[in-house]
Amino acid sequence: MAKMQLSIFIAVVALIVCSASAKTASPPAPVLPPTPAPAPAPENVNLTELLSVAGPFHTFLDYLLSTGVIETFQNQANNTEEGITIFVPKDDAFKAQKNPPLSNLTKDQLKQLVLFHALPHYYSLSEFKNLSQSGPVSTFAGGQYSLKFTDVSGTVRIDSLWTRTKVSSSVFSTDPVAVYQVNRVLLPEAIFGTDVPPMPAPAPAPIVSAPSDSPSVADSEGASSPKSSHKNSGQKLLLAPISMVISGLVALFL
């Protein structure tokens, strides 16, 4: 009995020793670094607020709101995959738009006109140089509503057949939203047709006559008059003796 208890005691001690040695031999578990927090999503640009405070764009903003196009543009602005590029005419551009008048447009035509002022992609100013080589670019209004772009020494020009203007300033340009100011309302051929009235010829430059160094006629006459008077006096003195001689000869024959 005592031998059996001793054997059990020895076995228990052996198990304890083996377990302790196993724990000592095993390496400590690695400590993992904390997972970094995800970067905050970029804040979306509120187009209504931007156009309200960025410049004199109240007329264009009113058209955006009345036609509901602002929702289309805002949804596209929130799409960071493509983004949006908007060309915004100043209030003065709408005041100057007399022919053709915008007041005759139907509600659908007015909506298409507003959609015509945006591209369904973000373009920085530097990207218009390559864009000008790709031909007409479709706008939000659809395939028939396209714009042509040319880049001349960094100046972006826009052509819609009815309208030729340029980007006068960058209002906002941070991917995915670009807003550029233009000085004229973009008129699409799909609404107004191809019968474009001739553009008024530029006013001729005023003719400025160069100052002449030669004296005027009056000055010439005034300058030559003393010489003429001296010449006439000399002629009179020369003719006086001749007249006297002739008079004497006539008297002898009489």
Swiss-Prot record:
Q: Spell out the GO cellular component terms annotated for this protein, sorted alphabetically and separated by semicolons.
A: mitochondrion; plasma membrane; secretory vesicle; side of membrane
Lipid attachment points (GPI-anchor amidated asparagine): 232
Tell me the protein's name: Fasciclin-like arabinogalactan protein 7
* Primary location recorded for the protein, binned into one broad class: membrane
Q: Where is the composition biased (Polar residues)?
A: 222-233
Q: Which residues form the signal peptide?
A: 1-22
**Annotated InterPro entries:** FAS1_dom_sf (IPR036378), FAS1_domain (IPR000782), FLA_A (IPR045003)
Q: What family is reported?
A: Belongs to the fasciclin-like AGP family.
**Organism annotation:** Arabidopsis thaliana
Q: Which residues are glycosylated?
A: 46, 78, 104, 130
All copies of the FAS1 domain together span: 44-186
The entry's keywords: Cell membrane, Glycoprotein, GPI-anchor, Lipoprotein, Membrane, Proteoglycan, Signal
| Low complexity bias locations | 206-220
| Topology in membrane | Lipid-anchor; GPI-anchor
Localisation: Cell membrane
Q: Provide the propeptide boundaries.
A: 233-254
- Gene3D superfamilies from the UniProt entry: FAS1 domain
| Known role | May be a cell surface adhesion protein.
